[in-house]
Amino acid sequence: MSVEEKARIGNSEEPIIIETGKYAKLTDGSVVVRQGGTAVLVTAVMSDEPITDVDFTPLAVDYRERASAYGRIPGGFTKREGKPTDREILVSRVIDRPIRPLFPEGFFHDVIITALTLSADDKYDPDVLAITGASAALHISRIPFEGPIAGVRVCRVNGEFVANPTYEQRKEADLDIVMAGTKDAIVMVEGGGKEIPEEVLADALFFGLDAIKEVIEAQERLREKVGKPKFEYQKVELPEDILKALEEECTPKILEAFNIKDKKERYSTLDKIVEEFIEAHQIPEELHFAVKYFYKKLESRLMREKVLKEGVRIDGRKPNEIRPIWIEVHPFERPHGNAIFTRGQTQAYVTVTLGTPDEALIIETIAEGEVFKRFMLHYSMPPFSVGEAKPWGPPRRREIGHGALAERAIEPLLPPEEEYPFIIRVVSDILESNGSTSMATVCGASLALFDAGVPMKDNKHVAGIAMGLILEKDRYVILSDILGDEDHLGDMDFKVAGTKDGITSVQMDIKVKGITKEIMLDALKQAREGRLYILEKMYEAIPEPRKEPHPYTPKVEVVDVPEEKAPLIIGPGGSTVKKIYDETGVKVWVGEQGKVYLFVFPGGDVEKAKQMIQDIVREVEVGAVYKGTITRVEPYGVFVELWPGKIGLLHVSKMAEPVRSATEKYKVGEEIIVKVLDLDELGRPRFTTIGIEDVGTEKKEVKPKVGDVYEGKVVRVEPYGAFIEYAPGKVGLLHVSKMKERVKDARQKYKVGDVVKVKVVEIDEQGRPKFTDDV
C-alpha cells in the first residue's frame, strides 16, 4: 500500500512530498522524497546480528546520482557511472552526520543507508531531500532511531532568508548552508558565506529550524500509518560489582592521566589503566569489551565534570584558551608558496601551486555537465600524523570532506579570474594531528597564498578555529580550539572559518538536544575572539601578499590586442601559441575582450613573447608589397610569412606565372615578393604576385596599360593560348582568338622558350594583361 504525506518547508516555493510502500519494499524502510521535479529514493537496511568488538553503530551511507535523472548520458569511455564522485561523497557525509548521533547507545548492528536520485529538475538540489529521506526511512523501519529529523538549505538572497531555494536563487545568495534538525534542536550545519556576521548565521540557523517543523510532523504521521515495531537489541551489560570497582579504582588514575599534555603519552597511560584493571581483577575474556566500553563512558564523564566544575581542560587550558601557535612561512625553496602552521600538537604543511588556465580541473557533473574549477584545495592526513604504522592510501571520505570545508573558507577571498587568471592548487599535508586539522589547513592555506603573492581580497587572511561544548542540564562550557579527545567526548564540534569581518565557512555537529540561540551566539562570539587572536599571529608572520614573488613562482603579464585578432594568436589547432611557448618558454592564454595573458615561468623570455604577439596582430596594408619567406608549399599554393606569426596564402590562381602546382616552382625557405590582395575572415592576408616587380630589395609595382608593346618569352602553352612572360615574374595570356594567324590549338604555333612580340589589348580584373601578336 502506497502512503504519502505532504508538508510545506518554510517559504520554499513548492512542498515536500514523502511517499512509502511503492518502491524497494524488501528493505527495512524505504521512501521517495519529492520537491518539484526532483525525487530521491532512500532505503535503510539493518543486519540481524550485531558486529562484535566495536563500540559505535557501524553506519554506512551511500548517496548516488544517476545521469538519467538529469536526462544525460555519462561521459568517459564506458558511458556509465563509476566510483563515487566528490560531490556524492560530500552529500553522503551530510546525510551521515545528523543521523549518526541518533542511534541509541550500545546499538552495534550494521546499518546501510542508500540514497539514489531518480529525477532532478533545474530548481531543487536533491541533497537536502536525501537527508529527510534517510530520517523517514529509519523512522518507519524496525531500526532503533531517536529521530525524526529533516534537512533544509537556507540561503540569504537580497537580505531575506529562503528555505530550499532554487538554483537561480542560490546564485544570488551571500549565505548558503545545509542544516538538519529535530523538532526543537539543530543537529548538523554545513555551508558558507561571503564574510557573514555571526548574528546573521545564528538567525539563519533558527530560521531553518522553524522551517523543518512541518516536515518532521509529516514523518510522525507516516510512522503512525505504516511504522514497524522497533527492534529489541542486546545492550552492553556489566556485573554491578565489576562496574563499581571500575569506577572506584580507575577514577583517580584517569584524573591524573588528564594532566598529561602530550597526546601519545596520555593515550598510552589511559589505555594502560584499563588493561591493568582487567588483569588485576582477572576479568573473563567475554567481558573485556564491556569493561572497556564502560571505561570509555567513565572517561567521558570525568572529563566533562572536570571542565564544568573546575573550568580546566584535559591539557590544563582554560575554556577559551588557544594552544601555542608557531608559524613558518616559505620554509622550502621550490614551491610557489608554502607555510607551516602549528597549533599545539596539530601541524599542517600547506603548499600553493600556480598553473595556467589549461590546467583547470574539469569535473563532469550530472547537473551541469562539464565544470571548470580554477581553485582546488586538497587535504591529506597520512597515518604517521597520529603515530600509526600504516601505509598511506588514497583520499578517504573524511579527507575529501575536510578539503571541501577549507576550500569553501578560502574561495570568497580569491581575486577575480579576470584580474588573476592563474589556476590555484592548494595542498595541505597534516604532519601532526591532535584535533582541528581542517582549521589548521585553512590558516596554513591563507599563509601559503600570501607567500605565493596571490592578491587576496583587501589583503585579508582567513583563519579557522574548532569549538566544543560541554552541556549538562542548565550548565554549559564552550571550549575554544578543541583537542581530539574533546571532540569525541564533548557535545558539539563547531568549526568556524573567516576573516576579521565575517564567516566564510562553517561546519557543526551537535550530539545533544537543547542548544539554545543564547548558547549558539555565545559559541559564535567566543569563536570570533579566537579567530581574531589567530589572525593576529598570522599577520605577524606575513602581513600582506608578497609584492615580489619568489624566483620559482610564475608571473603573469597582460597584453591587450584587438578582440577580432585574438584567434590569430591561437592559430590553427593552437599551433601559434605552441610556437610561442617553444621559442620563449612563455605560456599564452587568450581570454575575453582581447586580453592575452602571458604566464612567465623561470627562464621564460616574456619580451620576446610580447614581440611575437605584436607581430601577429600587426596590421598589413591591403595593396602594399612585402618581402616574405615561404614556410609551406602545397599544390594549391604557398604560405608566405611576412614576419613571425603573420602568414598568408599565395594561391596558384594569384601567381603572375600560372602553374598547375605550386610545388613545380617554389620551395620552403625561398624569399618572395608579394602584394596583399585582401584579408580573409580571420584577418589573414591573401597574396598575389601579379603586377609587381622584384628589383633587388626594392618593391617596384608595374602596371601594364592597353597599347603597351613588349618582347616576351613563352613560358607555358595550352590549347587555348600561350602564357607570355613580358617582364621578370610577370605573365600575361595570348589567347588563340587574338593571334594574327588563326589556329585551333596554340601548340600548333608556339612552344615554350619562343620569343614573341606582343601588344596589350586588355587588362583583366586582377590586373593581368591580355595580348595579341598582331603588332
Swiss-Prot record:
UniProt subcellular location: Cytoplasm
Lineage top rank: taxon: Bacteria
Primary site of residence: cytoplasm
One Gene Ontology term of the molecular function aspect: RNA binding
PROSITE patterns in UniProt: KH_TYPE_1, S1
GO terms classed as biological process: mRNA catabolic process; RNA catabolic process; RNA processing
Record EC number: 2.7.7.8
Domain S1 motif: 623-693, 707-775
Role according to the record: Involved in mRNA degradation. Catalyzes the phosphorolysis of single-stranded polyribonucleotides processively in the 3'- to 5'-direction.
NCBIfam families attached to this UniProt entry: polynuc_phos, PRK11824.1
Name of the protein in question: Polyribonucleotide nucleotidyltransferase
Source taxonomy: Bacteria, Pseudomonadati, Aquificota, Aquificia, Aquificales
